[in-house]
Amino acid sequence: MVVPEEVSHFRPINLCNVTYKIISKIMVNKLKLLMAKLISPYQNAFIQGRNIFDNILLAHEIIDTLKKKTDRKKGYGALKVDMCKSYDRVSWNFLKTVLISMSFGNYWVHRIMECVSSMQYALLLNGSPTHTFLPTRGVRQGDPISLYLFLLCANILSIALIQG
């Protein structure tokens, strides 16, 4: 967008110190090893050994099959979920519950929640920064660990949709 017209059109800039980046990278390297075991086989993006293109092909096959269905009495359907700005909406309490339910240890849960909740925001108004304020939800965009935390939360949605 060339000229933003609403606050929602702005995207935050992720500024982290070197120590945070090192800690985050170490945690990501450990999380990567677990993701294939923790995440549903239907989630293919960003999981080692899986390919996102598999889901694209599957989606095309499903749509093609739905178009060919002649039995209108049975309920067939497809659902497309718009994940727009979903990083900003991840509940920290939900994330903590997900981590605990997936048997992450107290040390890991505490460290991850420290990473998530340590961010602050400030706005530039007429070139001058405002006072900082603290968010109560969301994960940092551009932070490598945020991707994996988001996948863990989105996996719960995937499971709920599958189970009906």
Model regions: which residues?
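Nucleotidyl polymerases of mobile genetic elements and RNA viruses
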Residues: 1-164
